Amino acid sequence: MILETKFEYFRRYFILARKFKTMDGNTAAAHVSYAFTEVAGIYPITPSSPMADYVDQWSAAGRKNIFGDTVKVVEMQSEAGAAGTVHGSLAAGAMTTTYTASQGLLLMIPNMYKIAGELLPCVFHVSARTVSAQALNIFGDHSDVYACRQTGFAMMCETNVQEVMDLGAVAHLASIEGRVPFLNFFDGFRTSHEIQKIAIWDYEDLKEMTNMEAVEEFRKHSLNPERPAMRGSHENDDIFFQHREACNKYYNALPAVV
């Protein structure tokens, strides 16, 4: 049996086997993220609201993810609450996602440190938007995502709708296998609301690419009375430093995973 070449693999998965649809960037992000999501912690904010809205609609319609389940959507009182929901849900062993932008993303930063520090795989999808200063501005820039650079989240950026579909999947797959959370972002309005004809992912193909052993390993580390474990402890500076340094091997390995 002749092994499939990389070109043949690319041609089979990326060109021949995929259907084409017309959609905007938010819809593309919602489509690909729904596949990997068991719980979505949401709170609407322009211009990312359509992502959460689509996920909510598909959940209500009974759409299944790659695990054969319908996504549980939890709308909180603010983005801070949504991020707390993501953290708690991940700690309980559920693949969890959220969608936000601008000041909403800034409210999530405290929980982002916790999620990254505990090596919990997840993806925050962000339609990057100006952080309001002397006035409100709902249009795109990267002032929100730049504020998150030292949280420990890896960052993936897209420049068009097709990239949102493809690299959005990469963010989820790499987070699962690499145990590092991702902030996946694209320009608010310029990409989030840009309409293009793109090749979409079939959920069966995404399931085939998912490292299910890594998913099961993630679930084994969840909070469970059958497997007692300590979380949220207090550490002095010497031990705290050692534990922070212990994360480095996952970040060093991540480029190869991506």
Positions of the model-derived regions?
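Electropositive phosphate-/nucleotide-binding environments in soluble metabolic enzymes
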Residues: 20-23, 27, 34, 45, ...
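Short basic, glycine-rich beta-strand/loop surfaces that mediate nucleic-acid
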Residues: 117, 171, 198-200
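Short flexible/disordered coil segments
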Residues: 104-111, 134-140, 158-164, 186-193, ...
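Conserved thiamine diphosphate
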Residues: 138-188, 212-215
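Aromatic-enriched
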Residues: 2-17, 194-206
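Conformationally flexible catalytic loops at phosphate/diphosphate-handling active centers
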Residues: 67-71, 182-258
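Thiamine diphosphate
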Residues: 8-147, 152, 169, 188-189
